[in-house]
Amino acid sequence: MTSSLLIPTVIENTGRTERAYDIFSMLLNNRIIFLGAAIDDRLANLVVAQLLYLNQQDPEQEISLYIHSPGGNVYAGLAIYDTMQAISNPIATWAVGLTASMGTILLAAGTAGRRIALSHATIHMHPAGGGTQGYTTDVEIQYKELKRMDDLGQAILAKHTGQSVETIAADFERDRWMDAETAKAYGLVDQVSAQSIKAVAEG
């Protein structure tokens, strides 16, 4: 999904015909979405479109969302989050590699019992960032918006982890890094995968 990378093509042979898919389309055909970059408007639009497509194809079958992302734009991430909450499908979320910031919120937002971290995944939480500069009034407006985003992120994480908003707020004061087991104890995921992805996916 990054233009500078060579995207592999997969050939599907049905016995009568052959069809070529790029690897992400092939995954989508198997109800798998891979969020593997910093979250911006473009990536969010792609993920939202895929979620809506899979929901239209089958409103009950599970969707798998694999996340390897340093986070990114909060507004774009919330577009993905709200879509995840709006559709009827159960969504299995997978932490792969690094899942940070907004990526961590999306990880926690998966269907209860179906939030999984691979054994060497790293999960990271931190407050909404961004320097403020300009006229005093502008700085105050920017600060209020950052505070609103922080409060919203904390409320969402409290909802999905079972932690209190106060605990989340305290942990948001500094960067917090977790391994897979720590993330499970915190309530960000339900399982740490010690078996094959196929075995966990089949539940």
Predicted regions and their residues:
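N-terminal organellar transit peptides
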Residues: 1-104, 108-203
